[in-house]
Amino acid sequence: MQRWVLHIDMDAFFASCEQLTRPTLRGRPVLVGGVSGRGVVAGASYEARKFGARSAMPMHQAKARVGFGAVVVTPRHIVYSAASRRVFQIVEKRAGIVERLSIDEGFMEPEALVGATPEEVKQWAEELRAEIKEVTGLPSSVGAGSGKQIAKIGSGEAKPDGVFVVPVDKQHDLLDPLPVGALWGVGPVTGSKLASMGVETIGDLAALTQKEVEISLGATIGISLWNLARGIDDRPVEPRAEAKQISQEHTYEKDLLTRQQVDAAIIRSAEGAHRRLLKDGRGARTVSVKLRMADFRIESRSYTLSYATDDYATLEATAFRLARYPGEVGPIRLVGVSFSGLEESRQDILFPELDQQIIVPPAPDTDYEVGVQSSSSSESTQVEAPQDVALSMWCATQDVYHPEYGHGWVQGAGHGVVSVRFETRSTTKGRTKSFSMDDPDLTPADPLDSLDWADWFAENGETGDDE
């Protein structure tokens, strides 16, 4: 009977959560990420992607592409984690076993769809997406096929906010023209080897004989990739153990002999590990740097922060504190950076100043001012960081609470004044109020309150307030 594996991927998840909880941002180009000189984009709304902005891009580059209309929002992973738990609670209730890949995507193989027609699969997926949208307000895309590979490619084709079902008799029409790098497991090394053989597309790989594949790529990995290229994918859908550590390391053909070479290698590994950390959705407390010298000695040094963070500048600066150089340890062959002590609880969300413990605050970036301009109104929203922001307890996009106006977020702070937009998921676009920076009625707030899911938090033993 026909097997159906489905892959669900939340659309622009981090940015969608921001637009959900801050109605002012809906329909506007949102960039989620750090605003320091080395900040990177953790998520970009589809409005921002139209300008070429994307995840893992340096923030300054993304802001330049989007222009003045870009809204830069500090990540709130505590919000994204809660939204993810609620989404996958719905998915698991409908599908049973779910194989979570990250905070915003996963595989499922519903028993109810064994032997189903493509039309029935599409209907099932649409009903799932509709329930997720109704309950959480978040958009999602679903791909379906005979295995994980086809399902994941299908969800990409379904974006944004759609369903893409690939019948068995149509899967080669989808697979064959795609670049071979689209296959699971084809990295730079394997890709280069295939390119040297004249294999550029998945169809090219599928057309090889088994003997050619075994000789070129090996009997294990090679045959596995060959089967995927031919649409054969019997990997089971099963729960994954949660990662305890996220790392990336690189071995260099030539020994690293200078401080500059090692610094570049640390940045390369830190950036790669950080991309995976953002996808995971948690913050890290411990940073480790691993070195393997030319004589095969291995040295690993670690530092544990007092809180978990995903702020790249903080993590990178910590890695540099741990670095050792050829003048100290001799020629270096391998450099790796890892993040561990992974936590969903994020103190730096409530207290943004924590991320200044490791790094010296950079000079104000005069290009940081970003705005939101409504297409239907002359009213604008300025999210800004003037020169005296370092002296203020208030940071742009920080969650706050006022006893009269409720939950809101900081749009700008400076010159003794803080401007706050009061709104949550369940409100319409909120009004902006200005207060003295030392107003005793204005206090930091739990970002979870912006979701306004008090009943759900109570039912699931979680908290959505400051207590």
Curated annotation (Swiss-Prot):
Its cofactor is Mg(2+). It is an enzyme of class 2 (transferase). It is found in: Cytoplasm. Keywords: Cytoplasm, DNA damage, DNA repair, DNA replication, DNA-binding, DNA-directed DNA polymerase, Magnesium, Metal-binding, Mutator protein, Nucleotidyltransferase, Transferase. Residues 5-187 form the UmuC domain. One of its GO terms (biological process) is error-prone translesion synthesis. The active site is at E105. Its EC number is 2.7.7.7. Mg(2+) binds at D9, D104. InterPro entries: DNA/RNA_pol_sf, DNA_pol_Y-fam_lit_finger_sf, DNA_pol_Y-fam_little_finger, DNA_polymerase-Y, DNApol_IV, IMS_HHH_1, Rev_trsase/Diguanyl_cyclase, UmuC. GO terms for molecular function: damaged DNA binding; DNA-directed DNA polymerase activity; magnesium ion binding. One of its GO terms (cellular component) is cytosol. It comes from the Bacteria. The record marks F14 as: Substrate discrimination. It catalyses: DNA(n) + a 2'-deoxyribonucleoside 5'-triphosphate = DNA(n+1) + diphosphate. Residues 364-383, 429-449 are annotated as: Disordered. Belongs to the DNA polymerase type-Y family. Monomer. Poorly processive, error-prone DNA polymerase involved in untargeted mutagenesis. Copies undamaged DNA at stalled replication forks, which arise in vivo from mismatched or misaligned primer ends. These misaligned primers can be extended by PolIV. Exhibits no 3'-5' exonuclease (proofreading) activity. May be involved in translesional synthesis, in conjunction with the beta clamp from PolIII. This is DNA polymerase IV. The gene is dinB.
